[in-house]
């Protein structure tokens, strides 16, 4: 037998023996380290010739490949995490999305979303791209999301990070964790004020206002509503001399329905939100708010 053939047989024999030395315990250990499936772990260990670090790299590469192949998939499920600082001056909403409700309700997925949001809260990060470069478990959050995508086979994304600041920031998350609200008040440090803030947050969740007050509405929206009002008046056969007046009346109705402070309070329609807040504490009002819904 020639030396080349002998060497080839020697290498084949030792390679096969090495692969056979990958035990179920090894596979389970890698699974515990990475959370990947048993077969994926076995294949990665075999490809890495039993090297755990290399196997982890292989699995992460697989995750990146899966993520890339799913880049065009819709991620319309997930959770909203709402957090506020201890002094109630800073709040955030983190929207972490997936593809199915099954994954969205998974405890591990929820824990990952909360961990990501907590990093943003602890460092007062208000920019999504900055947050994605923060580290979690030795890798960036962006890499962690890719890794988790590979693990579960669904596209996982940090879709939005929204923050507000104020004297008293109150948060609300709807029971299904798919809708979150932040309200920034101009007063804080009072149980009554906090309770009122919670009521306002629930109002925002239910009524979805477009702005805090009339002056905060986008001018293009106002222009559109006036034109709609005029067209409706003309279609109803109203005289041209009163078309403008009718349109302005419809605009005021738009403000009542769609601006937070002018909306009727859902718990007591006899007052609007501005009046309700003023009853709780003289001069109490809303500085800003944020509303985030999964997939919206």
Residue ranges and their predicted role:
Residues 9-11, 18:
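Short hydrophobic targeting helices and cationic amphipathic motifs
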